[in-house]
Amino acid sequence: MSADSAWYLYLLECTGDSIYTGITTDVARRFAEHLSGKGAKYTRSRKPIRVLGQLRFDTKSEALKAEIEIKRLSSTQKRAFCAQLPATEPAR
């Protein structure tokens, strides 16, 4: 599988100490969309501060399944999950 077809689960720290979870093929691009107000409705009212973590998947289906599981976690559990992820380049 080429890197171009990879999907990523990503978590954003947002204002109000909240965490947004989503999937994309390009975390840096998607983070920029959230910052510009063109991302999800959630991040229009709770501005993103930084990318907490990201995890690569080979297929969109795998990423969607992981997104559903992560969205069920509490904020504390999501932060613990991110703390265990391998270090990645920050989204710009």
Swiss-Prot record:
Domain GIY-YIG per the UniProt entry, residue ranges: 5-80
Any Pfam family matching the protein: GIY-YIG
Superkingdom of this protein's organism: Bacteria
InterPro entries: GIY-YIG_endonuc, GIY-YIG_endonuc_sf, UPF0213_domain
PROSITE patterns assigned to the protein according to its UniProt record, in alphabetical order: GIY_YIG (PS50164)
Alphabetical list of SUPFAM superfamilies matching this protein: GIY-YIG endonuclease
Family note: Belongs to the UPF0213 family.
Protein name in the entry: UPF0213 protein H16_B0156
Taxonomic placement: Bacteria, Pseudomonadati, Pseudomonadota, Betaproteobacteria, Burkholderiales
